[in-house]
Regions:
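Fungal secretory targeting signals
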Residues: 1-22, 432
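Signature for phosphate-centric chemistry
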Residues: 19-145, 152-281, 285-432
Length: 432
């Protein structure tokens, strides 16, 4: 009896200790700073929302179009010259003995990564581009390999496209690469339409960013200054330090007009019944275009659920809105990709008797997204008629590229038409 009592006491003590240290059974959360670096985050799939990326039951993908940001680069010129290099130069010239400061002692022996040339795709970036090509081949095993892949003419987009081609093709010289000139008078007929848009400014939002940066870095600066008061820490130092670990604009009224060209061209490509067309369309661009396409599609809209369409209220300058939908690190890492799939859902329960079994859905980094006002298909996909109406409605809102951009040059166009060009591009071949 005494032994039973002792066992009970021991068991209760163990239970009490376990309760005080209780952890959720299925918690997988861990903070990874590389997933919070906005446009310089390495490619990852946040699975947001947490939905199955495979086609809905009874549906098969018949065609697909991808818009892909180039793979990881060493650094762009602006970031390197504004933040990265000034911080490392400051470190070289300081007399502070970092080895005697416990919290910052690593700086005594820290050597920054060698960036031989800015703007160039890294070795890991080339590998990730090839992996995306392999992933596509497994994801769409029944679709024909594309005849052509498109890329803007910058070296980093071309190299990224070549990497994907090498991962996607099964034999050498099957897929050609078509380069689309990054012109300043191309109108919407380009993979860099923002360069042909006089109203576009890459520095838009800088004032707001600087306002928030001062608040965000204030406690960090206070802590670092207490560690090393003679170093003259600045806001730019904090940004530079965080950028060395691993590049955001909101509320631009012309975004929808910049992104509509690709959305409209893609709808026409995927809905075409021409047997000579491709099954897979892949286009490489820079980080500026994918966010504008998401705006055109109405995705990750912070103000959508409020009905107020007050963008500024959803992105305050004095705190983090942790409930926001627009999270740059999730939607704009290197190699970020937006896919629009055309599906045949004749075998999907509840949809077998539809006159048109064709449905469309959008994926962002493999995560399925629901289009606002068009979710009448399996797993909230969009019917063919609904998608056509959706794109037409967006055209009424965003279809006037020349007007929205204030174009002053001749021969501008509101249409992205290079996909129908007879240019077959050039062979990429294997890298030996």
């Amino acid at each position: 009896m005494a032994m039973s009592t002792l066992a009970l006491v021991v068991a209760l003590a163990a239970l009490s200790m376990a309760s005080s240290q209780q952890q959720p059974l299925y918690s997988e959360y861990s903070f990874n700073p590389l997933e919070h670096l906005a446009g310089i985050a390495p490619y990852f799939e946040p699975n947001d929302p947490a939905r199955e990326p495979s086609p809905p039951q009874g549906c098969e993908v018949e065609k697909v179009a991808y818009l892909v940001r180039h793979a990881a680069i060493d650094a762009n010129d602006f970031d390197y010259e504004t933040y990265l290099e000034p911080f490392t130069d400051k470190l070289k010239n300081t007399t502070v003995d970092w080895s005697k400061i416990p919290g910052l002692s690593f700086l005594a022996n820290w050597t920054p990564p060698k960036l031989e040339e800015q703007e160039l795709v890294t070795r890991s970036g080339k590998l990730e581009a090839a992996q995306l090509g392999v992933q596509m081949s497994f994801r769409y095993p029944k679709l024909r390999l594309p005849k052509r892949v498109w890329a803007s003419t910058a070296e980093r987009t071309v190299i990224s496209a070549k990497g994907l081609i090498r991962g996607l093709e099964t034999d050498e010289n099957q897929i050609n690469l078509v380069q689309i000139y990054e012109g300043k008078e191309s109108g919407a007929d380009s993979l860099t339409p923002y360069k042909a848009c006089p109203a576009y400014s890459s520095s838009r939002g800088s004032e707001q960013s600087q306002t928030y940066a001062k608040k965000y870095t204030a406690p960090i600066l206070a802590r670092l200054r207490s560690y090393a008061p003679h170093f003259n820490w600045t806001v730019s130092d904090i940004i530079g330090m965080q950028e060395w670990c691993g590049y955001d604009t909101v509320g631009n009224p012309i975004s929808g007009s910049l992104g509509y060209g690709w959305v409209n061209a893609t709808q026409q490509l995927l809905s075409s019944d021409d047997n000579d067309d491709q099954d897979i369309y892949v286009s490489f661009t820079h980080r500026e275009l994918p966010p504008t396409v998401l705006v055109t599609l109405g995705l990750f809209n912070n103000s959508d659920s409020t009905g107020a369409n007050d963008i500024n209220a959803t992105m305050p300058l004095d705190k983090v809105n942790y409930h926001r939908q627009w999270v740059s690190s999730y939607i704009l890492p290197f190699l970020t990709n937006i896919a629009i799939e055309k599906m045949n859902c004749t075998g999907s329960y509840g949809y077998q008797n539809q006159t048109d079994p064709t449905y469309y859905r959008v994926l962002v980094n493999r995560s399925p997204q629901t289009l606002p006002d068009c979710h009448d298909g399996p797993q909230e996909s969009c019917s063919a008629a609904g998608f056509r109406d959706f794109v037409e409605e967006k055209g009424q809102m965003f279809g006037d590229f020349a007007g929205a951009c204030g174009v002053g040059y001749d021969n501008s166009t509101n249409v992205m038409s290079f996909y129908s060009s007879p240019d077959n591009g050039t062979i990429v071949g294997k890298k030996h």
